[in-house]
Amino acid sequence: DLGAKLALNLRAGDCISLIGDLGAGKTTLSRGLIQALMGADTEVPSPTYTIVQTYETDPAPIWHFDLYRIESPNELIELGFEDAEDDIMVIEWPENAGSLLPSQRLIVELIFTDNGRSARLTGTTPEWKQRLNDIFDRS
């Protein structure tokens, strides 16, 4: 499970941006990631209407954002978006964050294919690229 693999390698200050069409699996991936750290019984609702849900995990709290309904990045300031940067951020619809989106992040693009779905992972820093190599070399 991709979410679980990523979860076990997260650190405070990490940002994961999830890109994909409606129904591509962004919330499902987020749920798998959070449940890998908190237990399979943990309820992980989509934050579509609340915009953000937080979870106390080790190594750091996770802020799960769904920015689908955000009309302006300024709305994020009121929600504590910048406060989350020292913790772990998982962001659905990251394009709606504008310039507030951290530049150092892991981009996970979920794509519909003839056989279901696939994921393209891109690290924006050398550290993320190395971590991805480590994660998938062990798999």
Outline where the language-model segments fall.
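The conserved Walker
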Residues: 22
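Hydrophobic anchor at the beta1->P-loop junction of P-loop NTPases
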Residues: 16-18
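Short phosphate-coordinating micro-motif centered on Lys-Gly-acidic
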Residues: 72, 79-139
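Conserved lysine of the Walker
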Residues: 26
